[in-house]
C-alpha cells in the first residue's frame, strides 16, 4: 500500500504541477492569459486541494509512513492492514470528485479555504462546491482511518523492550501528526458539512441574513 500511495501521490503531483504552471503563466506577464477570472479561481482552488490532500499527505504520511513506521518498530505490518487498504482506496474517488467539481457548472472557484459567502448558493449555484465538499469528506475519512492505524501501530506493535523514548524521531513525527489530525479534521468536517446544509437544506449557519456568522466558518476551518 505504501508503494500505491507513492504512485498516486506522484500522479497527483504531476496534475498539481500542471495547475501550478497555469497559475504561473497567468501571473508571469502583464495582462490576462486565461481571460476568465472564475476559471483562474477554479485552477487556484484545485491546485491547493490536489497538492495538500493528494500529494503531500499520501506521500509524506501514507507512503513513507507505511514503508518506514512498521520497519522502525519491528512490526510485520500496520496494526489494521485492511483498514490501511481502505484508507488508500478512498483517495482515487476523492480526487475524481474534485476533478468533477471543476468540470461541472463553471467550477468551484472559492479558493481552497471554501469560505462563505463565496461558496454560498448565490455565488456558486450549481453542484460544483458540493462535489468539492464530498471530495474533502472522502479525503478526510481516509486521513482519519490512517491516523487511527498509525497511532494503534505505534502504541501496540513495537518490539518487546522498545520504549517510546527509543523510537526514531520519524515515528514520533508520524505519531504526533496523526494525533493532531484526529483532533482537527472532525472540526473541519463539521464546518464543511454545515456549509453543505447551508447550500442545500436551508440552514443559516454561515448566513448573516438568517442569524448565522460567516466568521464562524473561518474559526472552524483554521482550528
Curated annotation (Swiss-Prot):
Annotated cofactor note: Binds 2 heme A groups non-covalently per subunit. Binds a copper B center.
Transmembrane segments: 5-27, 47-69, 89-111, 131-153, 174-196
Mitochondrial intermembrane side: 28-46, 112-130, 197-223
Annotated GO CC locations: mitochondrial inner membrane
Segments in the Mitochondrial matrix topological domain: 1-4, 70-88, 154-173
Membrane topology listed for this record: Multi-pass membrane protein
Cofactor(s) the protein needs: heme; Cu cation
EC numbers on record: 7.1.1.9
Protein origin, superkingdom: Eukaryota
InterPro entries per record: Cyt_c_oxase-like_su1_dom, Cyt_c_oxase-like_su1_sf, Cyt_C_Oxase_1
Entry GO MF terms: cytochrome-c oxidase activity; heme binding; metal ion binding
The keyword Iron is assigned to this record: yes
Catalysed reactions listed for this entry: 4 Fe(II)-[cytochrome c] + O2 + 8 H(+)(in) = 4 Fe(III)-[cytochrome c] + 2 H2O + 4 H(+)(out)
Subcellular location: Mitochondrion inner membrane
Keywords: Calcium, Copper, Electron transport, Heme, Iron, Membrane, Metal-binding, Mitochondrion, Mitochondrion inner membrane, Respiratory chain, Translocase, Transmembrane, Transmembrane helix, Transport
Family designation: Belongs to the heme-copper respiratory oxidase family.
Official protein name in the record: Cytochrome c oxidase subunit 1
Species whose genome carries this gene: Sepia officinalis
Name of the gene encoding the protein in the UniProt record: COI
Amino acid at each position: 500500500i505504501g508503494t500505491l500511495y507513492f504512485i498516486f501521490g506522484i500522479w497527483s503531483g504531476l496534475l498539481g504541477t500542471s495547475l501550478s504552471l497555469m497559475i504561473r503563466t497567468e501571473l508571469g506577464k502583464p495582462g490576462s492569459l486565461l481571460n476568465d477570472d472564475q476559471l483562474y479561481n477554479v485552477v487556484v482552488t484545485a491546485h491547493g486541494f490536489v497538492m495538500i490532500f493528494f500529494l503531500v499527505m499520501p506521500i509524506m504520511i501514507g507512503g513513507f509512513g507505511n514503508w518506514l513506521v512498521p520497519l522502525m518498530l519491528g512490526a510485520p505490518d500496520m496494526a489494521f492492514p485492511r483498514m490501511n487498504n481502505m484508507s488508500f482506496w478512498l483517495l482515487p474517488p476523492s480526487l475524481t470528485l474534485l476533478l468533477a467539481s471543476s468540470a461541472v457548472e463553471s467550477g468551484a472557484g472559492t479558493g481552497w479555504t471554501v469560505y462563505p459567502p463565496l461558496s454560498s448558493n448565490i455565488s456558486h449555484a450549481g453542484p460544483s462546491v458540493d462535489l468539492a465538499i464530498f471530495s474533502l469528506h472522502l479525503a478526510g475519512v481516509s486521513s482519519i482511518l490512517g491516523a487511527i492505524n498509525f497511532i494503534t501501530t505505534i502504541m501496540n506493535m513495537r518490539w518487546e523492550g522498545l520504549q517510546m523514548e527509543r523510537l526514531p524521531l520519524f515515528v514520533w513525527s508520524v505519531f504526533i501528526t496523526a494525533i493532531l489530525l484526529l483532533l482537527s479534521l472532525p472540526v473541519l468536517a463539521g464546518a464543511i458539512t454545515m456549509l453543505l446544509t447551508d447550500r442545500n437544506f436551508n440552514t443559516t449557519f454561515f448566513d448573516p441574513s438568517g442569524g448565522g456568522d460567516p466568521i464562524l466558518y473561518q474559526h472552524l476551518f483554521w482550528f
